[in-house]
């Protein structure tokens, strides 16, 4: 058991080390450094502590050597520990490709061939992906349970019987009723979703426009975004009001408790929709179209079609969270651009790695609601493995964004550090398998994406 845990730590550390090298190469972090050191393995001339580019080049090669030693140690421990065949295969592939990667890096450093850096970076991502797969499969074998009994077709629990006890709540003053009603309408808008989705849109705008971004565009886009999120949340409350009564987590929602009548909630949702689309239209027509698409997708396609009918609801539903990236980019640029699409892909891939943690924590609640969430239908072991899959894919997509944009060291460092925190929280989730561990990984996922989006905004606007 101790040897297995040692191997898990080495494998996770190796994956993070490889990712550090990938992000450094994907962003502009090494652009000047490559020109400052065109020999290999050492740089010509004495080390100049005032030459930042030269120090970065030296640092990159030293880190590559250290990660190489880590790869060797991890491979030796892993192959000796008796891990399963596919884990061994993934380790061997990554370990064999690593010296090839070093050799290719040497050629890149000493050659002017423009196609080689791309191949060097792609190979690095492949090595990282190989180690992530090895980690996912090893954790599954180490911590998985054969005693799980997934429910293929979860049936909603009966709606709780009404309480006929007379209401003895003291009469409220007009001010108390007003505050309570306003608070209930605010809850309909799902305000907890707003900060992160607005950050997604802000990152899209920053990437598209850089320092030419105008305050008017920001205010109109984020204002429309807040209102569209509120509209989507309100319609979701209306459509799931009966199911909300069956779930502990949602049984106190305003419509489920009849605090707000359905008719009033629908009117409120429509008002928010029209207001958001009007603000989006002030930016441009395509932003308004994307905003309407986001509202319809979340309110109708996700809530009525995907969520109650397919185990892939979380994956496919990630499109709703990805749309703000395109909205932000189009608001600043006027058309859809490839970096904006890649940012949307990052959010799409991040969503399962993020939300599956919540699905684990509220597994019984989702089963009571009749939702075929991954932990309910496929089991907790499979769900934890998929979290690692999607986390690895998210990090690779983040590397691709670095290639397509002039993002630099701040983005690279943030993505690596917070990605490592997120990954380790997921490793602990596999080991502990508790509700607290699921919430820890959930919050780590929020911290990762929030920090990366802030880094994008700062990098694009200020650095």
UniProtKB/Swiss-Prot annotation:
Catalysed conversion reaction: heme b + (2E,6E)-farnesyl diphosphate + H2O = Fe(II)-heme o + diphosphate
Location of the region described as Disordered in the Swiss-Prot/TrEMBL record: 144-170
Region spans: Unknown: 1-193
Recorded superkingdom: Archaea
Gene Ontology CC terms, in alphabetical order: plasma membrane
CDD domains per record: PT_UbiA_Cox10 (cd13957)
Keywords: Cell membrane, Heme biosynthesis, Membrane, Transferase, Transmembrane, Transmembrane helix
Intracellular or extracellular location(s): Cell membrane
Pathway: Porphyrin-containing compound metabolism; heme O biosynthesis; heme O from protoheme: step 1/1
Biological process, per Gene Ontology: heme O biosynthetic process
InterPro entries, alphabetized: Protohaem_IX_farnesylTrfase (IPR006369), UbiA_prenyltransferase (IPR000537), UbiA_sf (IPR044878)
Molecular functions per Gene Ontology: protoheme IX farnesyltransferase activity
Main subcellular localisation: membrane
Transmembrane stretches, start-end: 6-26, 54-74, 89-109, 115-135, 193-213, 218-238, 265-285, 286-306, 314-334, 336-356, 387-407, 409-429, 441-461
Topology with respect to the bilayer: Multi-pass membrane protein
Broad enzyme group: transferase
EC number: 2.5.1.141
Residue span of region Protoheme IX prenyltransferase: 194-460
PANTHER family: PROTOHEME IX FARNESYLTRANSFERASE, MITOCHONDRIAL (PTHR43448:SF2)
Function, in words: Converts heme B (protoheme IX) to heme O by substitution of the vinyl group on carbon 2 of heme B porphyrin ring with a hydroxyethyl farnesyl side group.
Additional comment: Carbon 2 of the heme B porphyrin ring is defined according to the Fischer nomenclature.
NCBIfam families found in the cross-reference section: cyoE_ctaB, PRK04375.1-2
Family assignment from sequence similarity: In the C-terminal section; belongs to the UbiA prenyltransferase family. Protoheme IX farnesyltransferase subfamily.
UniProt-recorded name of the protein: Protoheme IX farnesyltransferase
Organism field: Haloarcula marismortui (strain ATCC 43049 / DSM 3752 / JCM 8966 / VKM B-1809) (Halobacterium marismortui)
């Amino acid at each position: 058991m101790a040897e297995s845990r040692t191997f898990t730590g080495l494998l996770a550390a190796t994956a993070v080390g490889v990712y550090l090298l990938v992000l450094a190469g994907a962003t502009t972090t090494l652009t000047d450094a490559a020109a400052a050191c065109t020999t290999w393995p050492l740089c010509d001339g004495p080390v100049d502590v005032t030459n930042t580019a030269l120090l970065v080049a030296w640092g990159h090669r030293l880190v590559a050597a250290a990660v190489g030693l880590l790869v060797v140690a991890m491979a030796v421990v892993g192959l000796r520990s008796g891990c399963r065949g596919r884990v061994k295969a993934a380790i061997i592939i990554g370990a064999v490709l690593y010296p090839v990667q070093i050799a290719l890096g040497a050629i890149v450093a000493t050659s002017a061939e423009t196609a080689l850096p791309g191949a060097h970076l792609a190979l690095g991502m492949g090595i990282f992906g190989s180690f992530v797969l090895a980690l996912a499969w090893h954790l599954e074998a180490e911590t998985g349970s054969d005693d799980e009994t997934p429910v293929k077709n979860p049936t909603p629990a009966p709606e709780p019987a009404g309480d006929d006890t007379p209401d003895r709540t003291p009469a409220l003053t007009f001010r108390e009723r007003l505050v309570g009603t306003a608070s209930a309408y605010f809850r309909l808008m799902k305000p907890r979703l707003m900060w992160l989705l607005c950050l997604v849109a802000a990152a899209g705008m920053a990437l598209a426009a850089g320092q030419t971004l105008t305050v008017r565009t920001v205010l109109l886009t984020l204002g429309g975004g807040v209102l569209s999120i509120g509209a989507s949340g309100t319609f979701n409350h209306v459509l799931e009001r009966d199911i909300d009564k069956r779930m502990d987590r949602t049984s106190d929602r305003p419509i489920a408790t009849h605090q707000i009548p359905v008719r009033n909630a629908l009117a409120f949702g429509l008002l928010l929709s029209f207001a958001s689309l009007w603000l989006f239209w002030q930016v441009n027509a395509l932003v308004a179209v994307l905003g309407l698409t986001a509202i319809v997708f979340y309110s109708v396609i996700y809530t009525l079609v995907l969520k109650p009918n397919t185990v892939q609801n979380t994956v496919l539903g990630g499109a709703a969270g990805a749309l703000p990236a395109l909205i932000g980019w189009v608001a600043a640029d006027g058309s859809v651009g490839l970096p904006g699409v890649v940012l949307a892909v990052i959010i799409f891939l991040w969503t399962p790695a993020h939300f599956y943690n919540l699905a684990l924590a509220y597994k019984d609640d989702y089963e009571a609601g009749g939702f075929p969430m991954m932990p309910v239908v496929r089991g907790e072991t499979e769900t934890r493995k998929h979290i690692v899959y999607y986390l690895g894919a998210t990090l690779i997509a983040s590397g691709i964004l670095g290639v397509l944009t002039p993002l630099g060291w701040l983005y690279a460092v943030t993505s690596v550090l917070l990605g490592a925190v997120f990954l380790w929280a997921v490793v602990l989730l596999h080991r502990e398998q508790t509700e607290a561990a699921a919430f820890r990984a959930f919050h780590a996922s929020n911290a990762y994406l929030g920090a990366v989006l802030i880094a994008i905004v700062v990098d694009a606007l200020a650095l």
